[in-house]
Amino acid sequence: MNTNLLYIPYRETDIIDLGNELRNIIKMEYFQPSSNFDRDLQAVRNLRNNISNLKNEQVNNNDETVCVQYYHQLSNVIKKFPDECVEFSWYGTLGYGRSGPTRSRSLRIEQLNILYQLGSYFSQAALMESRYSDEGLKKSCSYLQAAAGCFNSMILQIQKENEKETGMIRIPRDLQPETLQFLKSLMIAQAQETIWQKSLASGMKDSVIARLSIQTSEYYSTAAKYGNSSEFIKLEWINHVTVKQFHFKAAAHYRVSILNHEGFKYGEQVASLQVALSSCDSAFRKKKYVNDFVIEDLQGLTETIKSTLRVAEKDNDLVYLKPVPKENDLAPIPGASLVKPILPPAIESFDDSSVLFKELLPYLIVQVGQAYRERQDSFIRDSFIDPIQSLNKIMYKFITERNLPASIDTIQKPENLPESIIQHSQEIISYGGTKLIEDSLNEIAKLTLESRHILEGCQERLKIEADEDDIMRERQGSQRWARPKSSEASSEFINKINKMEQYLDQAKEGDQFIISQYHEIEPYLQLYCGGYKELIQFIPNSTYVKLDTKINEIIIKLRELINEVSRIENQRKQFLTRIEIKARNNNILPSIIDSFKKKQRKLYEENAAIDERSFEDVYAKHITMFNSDLRFLEDSKHAQIALEGNIDDLNQEFESEYQHTNNESQYKRQEVLQTLENVYTKYLELISNLNEGSKFYSDFIIKSNSVLKECDEYVYHRRVEGRELEMFLNNQAVPVESVGSQQSAPDFPPQPMGGTWNPNNGIKFG
């Protein structure tokens, strides 16, 4: 394009089959068949492929349509799919050749890139309009403001991301605010220049042209400042905007010199022309690599200023003899800004009828359903499983403390294995015996190691950030490096990490207890695992004792009550199985889906956050289906209390009647049987402790990974903040002329006008 303006080249991207990527996500994560969305998947695939085919300097209206459609469809995809579900690769094009690729697993980053492509489109469309017709200049200005609006929208979105405490996305380095600020400022400056050019063609007053010129200079000055702050803006562009800055400053003072001449202010006329010529000289010092059209314009202006200055100086020296003020003594030229970033209307509104994936559940709803399913699992564990295990423990402890059923087994079965011992052996073998425990201990050891690694990862990240901050604080000085120290900024994370370490230290003590608990009963567990043969050899026989009728009746009643204990235990096992089936057959997700469909329009219209709390009423209603089960559990608890009372009374009667007839062989057998009963009770307790330990570490890993992610986000946020502060401090230290952004700003602070120029109206001032 042969022009003295710059356009923003399209970013480049690798082609991916977005439709297929989303299809795989639907298959893995959703409860709907992907075939229901074949048309939508094909449509989004075509849109993404069209994006990868955009060509510089060949823009047409279809480019805008493709970008806008894909941008809006991405908005809906973001609502329906997890943000990190697809990886996209993009290449920067602002430097010398393309840079990258930058790979981002984020739909939001993809949408930012499309907004960038729209800004590029409008910048190129502006340069394709005629610079010699009133209509062409109007359209060009409108396009440039639209381009600035796209880049400004990107800046605002990125600022919101950087302000988030958690869940922030990693912004690619070449889309950092200083680069986007340059692009936005460049577009605004060129839009203002277009109005300036229109004012020339319209023959406007010199006072108007001067104000438009100085404002154009200030906009280019801002662009130069951001260009110097960004590592991705090439020298040609920085020199271009710097030359433009000085060019329009010169043009503004040249127009003011005409006004001074007309107002008989001959000294001020000469001073204004001198400032104009000095600005031209500053522009020429930055002409390297600058477009020939820009330099030709500058040369033409310079020649005009030189010839006018010669005449003005001669007339003043020979005729008027007026004092020539210095630049600082000249009245500032108020700027007249008639442009601003305008987000294209097509971006702000979209036809809902063409939205893709309308019938697909938002992934958030799937997550909410899963969250409530986990809550239901926790409810079942807390309300049924844990209480029943606790009741069973109490019941077993109660029986073993009274030497039951060993005391009556010794009498009734002096040589045979008691049925309870056989059942315990079969149960321990079915669970996996000692192998189950050793495997569980190995698993806990692995989980412990993983937990420690995550903890160390959190500590390492904070240390790295603190070291980086210390280096910059030492380099820049504590007064200049004006941001909170790492110890202050990371205090919340330090507290979390300290608590994590305390939890692990406490858990280590618990692990040691479990190991000692296992070693204590390990020989007896191996005996249980040996089955009938090992047990019959280990348990000593006792001599047969003839019992009187009363003791025999007591033993029979005790046996019945102990059998009732087994019956209650089996009843509870069956009860938990029924609970599991009920929970599995009554998934809460359909209820959440129905509720979402009823209220989704209201939620979206009110822009309300959809989260777990939005469906609390659904969960409360759903969980009432377990009310009858809660009543059963309460009845079972009362039945156990009554049963324990009966056993205790009868056992006391048994002990009082039988203590005189117990011989040594019976005592030894009873002692061994009681030991085996105690081992079984401790085995159940050990299994429970192992499960709790495994659950603790699994939960710890999930929660500590969240902390690790928060630490990553914190470090990233601090690095972005530090880079911006470093650039700010470095810019303060750069010599004035090298930045190319300061000549006009101190002397002529911008005075914003009352409105923004509408191309359909003339130029007006408030």
From Swiss-Prot:
Polar residues: compositionally biased ranges: 757-766
GO cellular component: endosome
Keyword check for Coiled coil: yes
Region (Disordered): 740-766
Residue ranges constituting the BRO1 domain according to the UniProt record: 4-395
Keyword Coiled coil annotated: yes
Coiled coil (residue ranges): 544-581, 633-692
Subunit description: Interacts with RIM101 by binding to its two YPX[LI] motifs.
Function (record text): Required for the proteolytic cleavage of the transcription factor RIM101 in response to alkaline ambient pH. May act as a scaffold protein that recruits the calpain-like protease RIM13 via VPS32 to its substrate RIM101.
Annotated family: Belongs to the palA/RIM20 family.
Protein name (database record): pH-response regulator protein palA/RIM20
Organism: Debaryomyces hansenii (strain ATCC 36239 / CBS 767 / BCRC 21394 / JCM 1990 / NBRC 0083 / IGC 2968) (Yeast)
